[in-house]
């Protein structure tokens, strides 16, 4: 049996492994668009733990499991005892006997870490207060689909505009893993922490990428191939009132037509959604031909399929045809003999 692996943070995977996941996702997307649904996860069950409500994450995982022949169970907030009457570890141990893989969207990053450390099955981080690795993978797939003509991913520059959200941190992790140039254009007090920058630095040593944090719009946007933004509330600052939030970010950090004009002519706009129209991005940009936000949303599904197959298929393969034939025959005999009971 292969050693169990989890998808908690992309720092746990090499660039080559990430590229392999991307290739799996793109190949299955192509297959499904051509009408063939590979039944790679037949009879497998995904348990989905949600401490936060979600649209894209839940629908993407459920659809992915159905398309690949499996089944997903939604464990809603308040429906399970996660860290309450029952410890996180006990929940992980029990669910390990009932489902084949777990996905958890949690309030605290330590919760998904504890689930992974205790569960006997793979655990996927569906988002925490630290990072959003499934979004990272979907965004990487989207960037590969929209590479500027004549450029490789390593030649590209991505600029994250605004607050240091989980998605901002994850965008930097993925960009520097792939060898891209990453810039956060955001105000002091709302920039990525030193702990995030250390991971980016280690990634860059291997990949040849770069990272920069700046408040200078011209430096940030120069030659940008991709511009990304997220809502204006981030990883670690105290909750701001709407008035304080607008005063901090508006208008300098709003992605509008003027800001877009400072980037490369072929620039693409990205947003993880949901977006607050008129705040971090204008309608004009969000709905523009260069906006790829709906492609991003679709590629959440592409990423989920890739992750589920990457982490579960080795266990499926290990069973082998001989094992399947053995148990099919034994079950058929048992049921035949017991038919008269």
Swiss-Prot record:
<dbReference type="GO" id="GO:0042450">
    <property type="term" value="P:arginine biosynthetic process via ornithine"/>
</dbReference>
<dbReference type="InterPro" id="IPR006131">
    <property type="entry name" value="Asp_carbamoyltransf_Asp/Orn-bd"/>
</dbReference>
<dbReference type="Pfam" id="PF00185">
    <property type="entry name" value="OTCace"/>
</dbReference>
<dbReference type="Pfam" id="PF02729">
    <property type="entry name" value="OTCace_N"/>
</dbReference>
<keyword id="KW-0963">Cytoplasm</keyword>
<dbReference type="InterPro" id="IPR024903">
    <property type="entry name" value="PtcA"/>
</dbReference>
<comment type="subunit">
    <text>Homotrimer.</text>
</comment>
<dbReference type="GO" id="GO:0019240">
    <property type="term" value="P:citrulline biosynthetic process"/>
</dbReference>
<dbReference type="GO" id="GO:0004585">
    <property type="term" value="F:ornithine carbamoyltransferase activity"/>
</dbReference>
<dbReference type="GO" id="GO:0016597">
    <property type="term" value="F:amino acid binding"/>
</dbReference>
<dbReference type="InterPro" id="IPR036901">
    <property type="entry name" value="Asp/Orn_carbamoylTrfase_sf"/>
</dbReference>
<feature type="site" description="Important for structural integrity">
    <location>
        <position position="29"/>
    </location>
</feature>
<dbReference type="GO" id="GO:0033390">
    <property type="term" value="P:putrescine biosynthetic process from arginine via N-carbamoylputrescine"/>
</dbReference>
<feature type="binding site">
    <location>
        <begin position="54"/>
        <end position="58"/>
    </location>
    <ligand>
        <name>carbamoyl phosphate</name>
    </ligand>
</feature>
<dbReference type="InterPro" id="IPR002292">
    <property type="entry name" value="Orn/put_carbamltrans"/>
</dbReference>
<keyword id="KW-0808">Transferase</keyword>
<dbReference type="GO" id="GO:0050231">
    <property type="term" value="F:putrescine carbamoyltransferase activity"/>
</dbReference>
<comment type="pathway">
    <text>Amine and polyamine biosynthesis; putrescine biosynthesis via agmatine pathway; putrescine from N-carbamoylputrescine (transferase route): step 1/1.</text>
</comment>
<feature type="binding site">
    <location>
        <position position="132"/>
    </location>
    <ligand>
        <name>carbamoyl phosphate</name>
    </ligand>
</feature>
<dbReference type="GO" id="GO:0005737">
    <property type="term" value="C:cytoplasm"/>
</dbReference>
<protein>
    <recommendedName>
        <fullName>Putrescine carbamoyltransferase</fullName>
        <ecNumber>2.1.3.6</ecNumber>
    </recommendedName>
</protein>
<comment type="function">
    <text>Catalyzes the phosphorolysis of N-carbamoylputrescine to form carbamoyl phosphate and putrescine. Is involved in the degradation pathway of the polyamine agmatine.</text>
</comment>
<dbReference type="InterPro" id="IPR006130">
    <property type="entry name" value="Asp/Orn_carbamoylTrfase"/>
</dbReference>
<keyword id="KW-0620">Polyamine biosynthesis</keyword>
<comment type="similarity">
    <text>Belongs to the aspartate/ornithine carbamoyltransferase superfamily. PTCase family.</text>
</comment>
<dbReference type="InterPro" id="IPR006132">
    <property type="entry name" value="Asp/Orn_carbamoyltranf_P-bd"/>
</dbReference>
<feature type="binding site">
    <location>
        <position position="105"/>
    </location>
    <ligand>
        <name>carbamoyl phosphate</name>
    </ligand>
</feature>
<feature type="site" description="Important for structural integrity">
    <location>
        <position position="145"/>
    </location>
</feature>
<feature type="binding site">
    <location>
        <begin position="271"/>
        <end position="274"/>
    </location>
    <ligand>
        <name>putrescine</name>
    </ligand>
</feature>
């Amino acid at each position: 049996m292969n050693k169990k692996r989890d998808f908690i943070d992309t720092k746990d995977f090499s660039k080559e492994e990430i590229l392999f996941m991307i290739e799996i996702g793109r190949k299955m997307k192509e297959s499904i668009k051509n009408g063939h649904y590979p039944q790679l996860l037949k009879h497998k069950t995904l348990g989905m733990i949600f401490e936060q409500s979600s649209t894209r994450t839940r629908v993407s995982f459920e659809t992915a499991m159905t398309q690949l022949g499996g089944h997903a169970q939604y464990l809603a907030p308040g429906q399970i005892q996660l860290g309450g009457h029952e410890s996180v570890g006990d929940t992980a141990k029990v669910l390990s006997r009932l489902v084949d893989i777990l996905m958890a969207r949690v309030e605290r990053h330590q919760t998904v870490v504890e689930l992974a450390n205790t569960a006997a099955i793979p655990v996927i981080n569906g988002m925490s207060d630290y990072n959003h690795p499934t979004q990272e993978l979907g965004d990487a797939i989207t960037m590969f689909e929209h590479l500027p003509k004549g450029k490789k991913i390593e030649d590209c520059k991505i600029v994250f505009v605004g607050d240091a959200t989980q998605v901002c941190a994850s965008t930097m992790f993925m960009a520097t893993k792939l060898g891209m140039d990453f810039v956060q254009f955001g105000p002091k007090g709302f920039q990525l922490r030193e702990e995030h920058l250390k991971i980016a630095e280690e990634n860059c040593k291997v990949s040849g990428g770069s990272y920069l944090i700046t408040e200078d719009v011209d430096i940030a946007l120069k030659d940008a191939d991709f511009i990304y933004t997220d809502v204006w509330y981030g990883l670690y600052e105290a909750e701001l009132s709407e008035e304080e939030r607008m005063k901090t970010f508006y208008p300098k950090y709003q992605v509008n037509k003027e800001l877009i004009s400072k980037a490369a002519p072929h620039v693409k706009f990205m947003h993880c959604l949901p977006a607050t129209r008129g705040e971090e991005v204008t309608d004009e940009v969000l709905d523009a031909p260069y906006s790829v936000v709906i492609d991003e949303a679709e590629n959440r599904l592409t990423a989920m399929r890739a992750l589920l197959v990457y982490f579960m298929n080795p266990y499926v393969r290990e069973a082998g045809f001989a094992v399947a034939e053995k148990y099919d025959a034994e079950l058929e005999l048992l049921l035949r003999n017991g038919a008269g009971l």
